Amino acid sequence: MGMVFWCLVNCGFLYYAISKLDLKKWQFAVVILVSVNDVFTAVLSQQYSIGITAMIIFSYVLIEKEKDFWAALMIVLGTMTKLYGIVGLAFFLFSKHKMKLTSGLVFWAVIVFLLPMLYASPEYVVHSYKEWFDVLVYKNGLNQFSVNQNISLLGMLHRITGASFSDLWIIVPGMILFALPYLRIRQYGNESFRFLFLSSALLFMVLFSTGTETYGYLTAMIAVGIWYVKTPTQATTPGLNLFLLIFCILLTSLSTTDLFPRFIRMDYVKPYALKALPCTLIWLKIVWEQLTQDFVRPSD
């Protein structure tokens, strides 16, 4: 019963978070349909990544609705339970109340840190966080060539090349590409531009983490769905957008199911982490759109 309740709460939380995005009914339906297989896969493994994804989306939604204090709670809660919640800070520059958001982050960080001390000693809580950090560092090294972990852009490049190099050679350029659109300050006021940042942030979290596993791609598929319905290039590159979406559904989402030829899955997709390929191409296109499209001009 506990497991069933856990899965229902996580799924309900994610569904509610997506429903709060400013999407038309058909757009909402597309996002759900694109991601449903990966959400189902994550549910079967009782993955907390469902809840983390919901928190990141909610942090975006609450900043959009100017409820920065509660957005801070989502960011802190996600960060202090699985670290990935820190991605919510990607929307900081879109906040109209940055001081309120900053003070909220400090307030909730203190509350969430102290709360376990109601039933555990301060020493135990501090030691637990230190051990958690040490484990994350240790696992980062183990995951580099793990078949079932690091199913990311990092893992794909390591496995295809067979080379052992520092992930920083990929992460640093990735961070620069991710951050470059922030320079287009005039575009901040356009909702489509901000939506693309949500998609980019969710994809970045998956593509540039050595801890990414199959179940984590529910986050990426939600990001892909949001990009597809909110991209400003539907009129200029509709064929390419549709191709990338179908390619992503086939290789990223369905490659782990029995609908996909087993020999391709076992001999190519899994050994070379090719699940990351379509999402990488889409992420690069998102960054290109953010850097080149005029979001200020009213869209059709």
Model-assigned labels for residue ranges:
Residues 228-300:
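Aromatic-enriched
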Residues 54-65, 92, 96, 100-101, ...:
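Transmembrane alpha-helices and membrane-interface helical segments
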